Amino acid sequence: MGEAIVITSGKGGVGKTTTSANLGTALAILGKRVCLVDTDIGLRNLDVVMGLENRIIYDLVDVVEGRCKMHQALVKDKRFDDLLYLMPAAQTSDKTAVAPEQIKNMVQELKQEFDYVIIDCPAGIEQGYKNAVSGADKAIVVTTPEISAVRDADRIIGLLEQEENIEPPRLVVNRIRNHLMKNGDTMDIDEIVQHLSIDLLGIVADDDEVIKASNHGEPIAMDPKNRASIAYRNIARRILGESVPLQVLEEQNKGMMAKIKSFFGVRS
């Protein structure tokens, strides 16, 4: 049986959906069967980031309400043979259209067919959040170095730690801009990890190419040379249990990099 990982953040705009798309893509590149599940009912975006929006016939709500079979709603990403699929959210319903138990049952069924079920969680802590975490085994919290984003991440971590069936969450710090961090204009990695007190899974540099790729429906993880792609692929390898040093970012402050490496036990 596979495992389900919910990707959450507490607030919108930190790159949660982009992270979901790229981690799913990276895991598929590594040969794992992956199903991406968009639980942001009424505000779906994962299909656009994946370039699959024109191929949706049925959606998550159709499945739980019995209007179609599970396999009829799954959208196959033909770029990855039989490895990557999307379960789209409904665009015309609201988040109360499904209950947590229904999502949990659906995820359990998906875990029978896939190595990884990546659940893209809506922003906030209301019904959409409850739906998304209901079937998860693990959680990844995405934040950016801004104080407001870290504060919201802290709140979500507190909620996740109350979930009996979810392992302790791990952290991805997204959209790192070295010059701002070096000048003290944003929180540095050490401050973020110490404040949130969870394991650091990976860091992703801010990169305009990520936005361009998402707008074209081609997750940046498909580009083997891009630095953000390398970061996402390394995060995927860590999810698989590999010990992978953090990528050294261009113009990275040496002192900060030493602190980051210490979290992974990597010697400079």
Curated annotation (Swiss-Prot):
InterPro entries: CobQ/CobB/MinD/ParA_Nub-bd_dom, MinD, MinD_FleN, P-loop_NTPase, ParA/MinD_ATPase. ATP binds at residues 11-18. Its main location: membrane. Belongs to the ParA family. MinD subfamily. ATPase required for the correct placement of the division site. Cell division inhibitors MinC and MinD act in concert to form an inhibitor capable of blocking formation of the polar Z ring septums. Rapidly oscillates between the poles of the cell to destabilize FtsZ filaments that have formed before they mature into polar Z rings. GO terms for cellular component: cytoplasmic side of plasma membrane; cytosol. It is found in: Cell membrane. This is Septum site-determining protein MinD. Keywords: ATP-binding, Cell cycle, Cell division, Cell membrane, Membrane, Nucleotide-binding, Septation. GO terms for molecular function: ATP binding; ATP hydrolysis activity. It holds the Pfam family CbiA. It is a peripheral membrane protein. GO terms for biological process: division septum assembly. Interacts with MinC and FtsZ. Interacts with MinJ.
